[in-house]
């Protein structure tokens, strides 16, 4: 098992892709801590992990709060005795894209704070523990929205997810000498939770248009999203850092 004896922390781990990643880590031997801002999601996520026989703990944490993040990370690292993997999957958008004049400063702050600052706070809290352990792996979450000019992503989200790429590369350079690797994943549209409902509500024409924008002409399975994250987090990618892995069916090539 790729993560036997490893301790992993997953933000946004209460549901959707974050929970699926936590389950993947756990099934391959990791003890897992999930952080999520939604108390019900943390409770449900822990129940799911425990039912699968995975050693797990959870905390209700808003990643925009650096003190809360640090306290939760320190607690998880202390409980496991070390911390080896961070999956910074927490993020968010304004939902339906808005024109520039309809985006308030508060709207912009919300998206930047959750995505960029949240990722920064989590990395800042985890790196000291990884240094103490002699190394580690961090996987950040960009998006097709940070890699293309897709009109469905919105300006704040596109800016935030592009910023994640810069954060990833610069952090990778800084912590590389400590044996810590930092890589980004850039998923496209994957159908879990809210996104599944949005896709199902589209007309047949609109769904076909979405699929036509993807060179592979189909949506991914949840496993096709989880497996690349596990690859980047594992020693299978031990000589890869500062990279971005597109998991969007080639959609990033469309511009």
Regions found by a protein language model. Give the residues of each.
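Canonical Rossmann dinucleotide-binding motif of NAD(H)/NADP(H)-dependent dehydrogenases/reductases
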Residues: 2-33, 171
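The beta1-alpha1 cofactor-binding region of Rossmann-like NAD(H)/NADP(H)-dependent oxidoreductases
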Residues: 39-40, 60-72, 105, 223-224
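Short C-terminal tail/terminal secondary-structure segment
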Residues: 97, 230, 241-255
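Substrate-binding pocket helix/loop in short-chain dehydrogenase/reductase
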Residues: 97-100, 104-112, 206, 210
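Active-site helix of classical SDR
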Residues: 123, 160, 168
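Alpha-helical segment proximal to the catalytic Tyr-Lys
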Residues: 128, 173-177, 238
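Residue(s) in the substrate-gating loop at a strand-loop-helix junction
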Residues: 143
